[in-house]
């Protein structure tokens, strides 16, 4: 049996009275990769020992470019992450300067935002090109970290980012702490109407029970008002200007605020509009479209290029809103 971490399947098979082997040849910690599996198979006698270079050596010879995890095309989290970056996380003196490299902490200006993140698809915003997040610890930690930074006297404006299912799971008590301790942290709840990262499970906010039956959905708006937050905002996940203006206002407030950014996960709803395309006559090669981190966007002939087979089209449209030249339009093909 080849399995990562604990020998769960191995032990279950052994309980059936079947002779089984596994952890004698494969590690109980860490992540499996082709080289580890190959070595284990050789030790088990499944594969012959080979004089050829190991898989790791052969792969390294290919010198493949790194491919970090990416958001899906049409992900409702992209606009919020892009907005947090564009609002001046690392360069608050300008809303248009989008440096490609992450600056060292010593270079962070005091007026910049600090963004504490949580566990979910939105955690991918820590990677380039977005580089929008500062912390990730465990489920529900983002809100407590944000309040802790505020109460410790950190001069920066602080925003906590958390998903809808994670907020219901372990974020509510953190929000209560903000209200109870008279904090003024802004909490952004990214509501994609599912638990996407672990397989699109439903949660109390979706109105579908664990058995798949319709039930009463928990209203996030009513919930956060119920714990004492007066400044509650709901914005579309695909309205870039609305997201940016709401965040800008809330972080300047002297009371707690919650922004619910709502938009369905495209992998669940499976809806799309007309694919978008780049008008090469209008494109000035500023590559602002690349900085939203959408895998449907690349470069062709020094101009932005959108892969129509990946683009969810006008049902998203974040790239067209980010383009200052209005060069991204609906495809005519």
Please annotate each region the language model reported.
Residues 1-3, 20-23, 50-54, 114-118, ...:
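General beta-strand structural signal in soluble alpha/beta enzymes
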Residues 8-15, 249-299:
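Glycine/aspartate-rich loop-and-adjacent alpha/beta segment that forms the canonical ThDP
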């Amino acid at each position: 049996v080849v399995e990562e971490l604990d020998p769960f399947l191995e032990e279950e098979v052994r309980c059936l009275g079947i002779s089984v082997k596994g952890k004698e040849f494969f590690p109980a910690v860490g992540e499996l990769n082709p080289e580890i599996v190959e070595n284990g198979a050789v030790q088990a006698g499944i594969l012959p020992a080979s004089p050829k270079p190991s898989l790791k050596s052969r792969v390294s010879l290919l010198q493949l470019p790194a491919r970090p995890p990416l958001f899906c095309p049409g992900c409702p989290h992209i606009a919020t992450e892009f907005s947090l970056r564009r609002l001046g996380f690392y360069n608050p003196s300008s809303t248009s300067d989008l440096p490609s490299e992450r600056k060292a902490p010593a270079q962070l200006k005091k007026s910049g935002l600090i963004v504490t993140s949580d566990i979910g698809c939105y955690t991918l915003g820590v990677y380039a090109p977005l580089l929008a997040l500062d912390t990730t610890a465990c489920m529900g930690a983002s809100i407590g970290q944000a309040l802790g930074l505020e109460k410790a006297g950190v001069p920066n404006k602080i925003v906590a980012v958390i998903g809808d299912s994670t907020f219901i799971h372990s974020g509510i008590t953190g929000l209560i702490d903000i209200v109870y301790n008279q904090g003024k942290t802004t909490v952004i709840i990214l509501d994609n109407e599912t638990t996407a990262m672990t397989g699109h499970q439903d949660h109390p906010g979706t109105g579908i029970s664990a058995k798949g039956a319709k039930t009463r959905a928990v209203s996030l708006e009513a919930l956060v008002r119920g714990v004492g937050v007066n400044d509650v905002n709901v914005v579309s996940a695909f309205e870039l200007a609305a997201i940016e203006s709401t965040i800008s206002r809330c972080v300047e407030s002297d009371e707690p605020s919650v922004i619910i950014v709502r938009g369905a996960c495209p992998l669940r709803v499976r809806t799309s509009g007309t694919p978008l395309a780049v008008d090469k006559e209008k494109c000035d090669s500023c590559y602002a479209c690349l900085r939203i981190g959408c895998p449907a966007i690349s470069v062709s002939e020094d101009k932005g290029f959108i892969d129509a087979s990946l683009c969810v089209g006008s049902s998203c449209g974040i790239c067209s809103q980010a383009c200052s030249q209005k060069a991204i339009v609906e495809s005519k093909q």
